């Protein structure tokens, strides 16, 4: 009987054959559909497989393999920023089940840890800011988990998504949604006694230097807590490679979050990692505080 490693290897070989041979053949036979699937690089990489037929999944995998390699960090940052301003809504629709299938079962534990970490100081925090709020589901959830917080602000680059969120959560008067660059908003409106949150892929689009400056700006506000739930490349070892690396097919940046928080003056009170959605990459959980 084949062992588990052999079985996984055979599955990998079969997958490579299907995507490399069958997928490419389907792309050749259906060029219009291929162009539609590949209209946007980031959407192609993240497209929800549940909404695709088997043939479309094979075509998608083959198309992802053909993506041009990008090494220019500034170009990557600009391309990703442009996407999140202009095209993000379609991706949020594609991945809208992620709140139920990923966030609730895999990520909420860190907010239970936050409650324990704050203890009697919970009432001192008057504002919670979610950077990269997306469809607003996480912010809405947090408003019920932290009833002592009076104000919940969701910031996103996409004006269209922000308008959708305002309509969707009109009945929750604690929620505010703002279309803005997070760095600019924090510089102008940030204050002490604030909890900052990112969830499952926001800070990965910052250049390392800008992210470091962003953490320093938040630290200067005064008393604050930061919960970062961010992906990292599966092969990124923070000890041997302390600086940011490219990862994935978008691509985006795998940052050494503990290092960047510490450099800004924060104390790390929680750090853990787990496989992200069962894949090679990792989901990193960081709890940092400025006091």
Language-model regions, residue ranges each:
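A conserved beta-strand element that flanks and buttresses the S-adenosyl-L-methionine
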Residues: 197-198
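Hydrophobic adenine-recognition pocket in adenosine-nucleotide-binding enzymes
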Residues: 202
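Mobile active-site "lid"/loop adjacent to the S-adenosyl-L-methionine
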Residues: 222
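Class I (Rossmann-like) S-adenosyl-L-methionine-dependent methyltransferase catalytic domain
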Residues: 2-189, 209-213, 217, 225-291
């Amino acid at each position: 009987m084949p062992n588990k490693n052999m079985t996984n290897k055979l599955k990998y070989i079969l997958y490579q054959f299907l995507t490399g041979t069958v997928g490419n053949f389907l792309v050749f036979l259906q060029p219009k559909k291929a162009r539609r699937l590949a209209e946007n690089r980031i959407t192609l990489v993240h497209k929800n497989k549940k909404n695709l037929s088997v043939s479309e999944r094979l075509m998608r995998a083959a198309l992802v393999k053909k993506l041009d390699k990008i090494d220019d960090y500034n170009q990557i940052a600009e391309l990703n920023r442009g996407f999140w301003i202009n095209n993000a809504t379609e991706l949020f629709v594609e991945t809208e089940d992620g709140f139920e299938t990923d966030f609730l079962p895999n990520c909420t534990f860190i907010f239970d840890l936050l409650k324990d970490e704050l203890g009697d100081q919970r009432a001192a925090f008057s504002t919670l800011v979610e950077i990269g709020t997306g469809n607003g589901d996480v912010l809405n959830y947090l408003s019920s988990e932290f009833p002592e917080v009076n104000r919940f602000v969701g910031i996103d680059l996409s004006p269209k998504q922000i308008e959708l969120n305002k309509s969707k959560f009109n009945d929750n008067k604690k929620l505010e949604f703002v279309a803005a660059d997070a760095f600019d908003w924090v510089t102008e409106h940030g204050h002490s006694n604030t909890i900052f949150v990112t969830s499952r892929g926001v800070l990965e689009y910052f250049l390392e230097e800008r992210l470091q400056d962003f953490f320093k700006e938040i630290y200067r506000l005064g008393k604050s807590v930061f919960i970062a739930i961010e992906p990292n490349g599966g092969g990124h070892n923070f000890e041997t490679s302390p600086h940011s690396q490219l990862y994935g097919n978008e691509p985006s940046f795998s940052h050494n979050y503990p290092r960047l928080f510490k450099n800004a003056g924060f104390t790390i009170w929680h750090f853990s990692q787990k496989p992200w959605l069962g894949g090679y990459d990792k989901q990193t959980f960081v709890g940092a505080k400025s006091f």
